[in-house]
């Protein structure tokens, strides 16, 4: 990996692959939310001047070929979120962004923590362009409570029903909760009671393929060797869940893979974008910065997701022409 000086100028301490062939890992960062916007793959990670451990702002990166990544500057900073200090906590950090789009606008959902001494919270900010600037909605959308940590938001629009769902939760309590959003994308319509699937810890992600809904999520301590990605399937976006097993686990070279996104390219190929530690010493807890990687996803004939082989290969190349696919819906 090479460092782009433009990132330092933008105040984002993330290392991005420079022009040329980018091999895994792609750049430093954690909790990557990825989505296709036009003919570009966009990645929204946790990171900032304090790295992913003490982030006070969000940035984004985009690529047309998965070889050259363009830093898109700051989306929003902690000091632009007016309500963030109203809980009296001595410090606040931002992590785990999730982005959704509706009606030509972009909605950035994010976690504010830590959980102690006050509950973690989820906020949402709005922009007319994916690179922002984002304007916060003015109030927290979700607040944690005893047994539930309000973290790791992910928004999914079910194209069958048109309903918009917010998935969140994990870590302390390891509880999944789901809400239906109002069409304005910044208000809660109601909470939908769901079961927490087996081995759920945090980082829920929902996508649909061929009428089957896939709920994938991270399991284990975030900086430990058992951190991994598992999944369950369902006939609806809210269950009932059928646990299917782990699809992304650590190996001798790559540790703690998780907090991921699924993306489908215009030609129908599927990718998983996730963070991991590479060559981390010892059995954990791991330290230092995590890195973002991209690997291929394949499905068995019965619809199961095949286990992912983590690679240090070139990232899959985006096709030259942008088309439309109906196989997977994650927006």
Regions found by a protein language model. Give the residues of each.
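Positively charged n-region of N-terminal signal peptides that target proteins for export
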Residues: 1-4
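Bacterial N-terminal signal peptides
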Residues: 7-15
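Carbohydrate-active catalytic/glycan-binding domains of CAZyme proteins
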Residues: 18-331
